[in-house]
A protein has these predicted regions:
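Phosphate-binding site of ATP-dependent enzymes
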Residues: 27-120, 141-148
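ATP-grasp fold ATP-binding core
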Residues: 3-23, 44-54
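Short small-residue beta-strand/loop micro-motif enriched in glycine and branched aliphatics
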Residues: 19-20, 101-104, 159-164
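Short, small-residue-rich loop/turn micro-motifs
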Residues: 14, 79, 94-96, 153-156
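ATP-dependent carboxylate activation and anion-phosphoryl transfer catalytic cores
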Residues: 2, 109-168
């Protein structure tokens, strides 16, 4: 019954995984069970989220010592090019195998208000989870300037294709 009320597309993903492993974009209700099983193959706990249309922006946060405020880097933006092999979303294939399909733009092309919003929200998210050390907060920035937190990643990638190191 709950599936009848969902707005598609949906994204089904493991609750505790990285690198976009096990994530499926679901366009039709009948594809939902297979997507849930794909996510469960990675983690028994599964999230189902409504798809959000927006630019993908990431913000690196580094925890301070004691009462020091966390440091927040300039936001970076993931820009994908389907003509060079990017998938429908920033999936494992696009992140690690379709290098020509992704451009990491840092600093992100944001308005001053959008920049302030994602940076302050990233710091708030870091503090809300009791963050320590490094974290990356991923957003969707919508056409009307809203910033929607996609996830808080407490183990951001450090590969040659990862955004976190570029943001500092």
């Amino acid at each position: 019954a709950a599936c009848e009320e969902l707005d598609y597309p949906l994204f089904v993903k493991p609750a505790r995984a990285g690198s976009s492993l096990g994530i499926t974009k679901v366009e039709r209700r009948e594809d939902l069970p297979a997507a849930v099983e794909a996510a469960r193959a990675v983690d028994p706990k599964v999230l189902v989220e409504t798809g959000i249309t927006g630019r993908e922006v990431e913000v690196a946060v580094l925890g301070g010592h004691g009462d020091d405020a966390p440091r927040v880097a300039e936001p970076g933006e993931i820009v994908m090019d389907a003509s060079h092999g990017a998938g429908e979303f920033y999936d494992y294939q696009t992140k690690y195998l379709a290098h020509d399909a992704v451009q990491m733009v840092c600093p992100a092309r944001l308005t001053a208000a959008e920049r302030e919003l994602v940076m302050s929200t990233a710091a708030e998210a870091f503090l809300a989870i009791g963050g320590e050390g490094l974290t990356r907060v991923d957003f969707f920035v919508t056409d009307d300037g809203r910033a929607v937190v996609n996830e808080v990643n407490t183990m951001p990638g450090f590969t040659p294709f990862s955004m976190y190191p570029y943001m500092w």
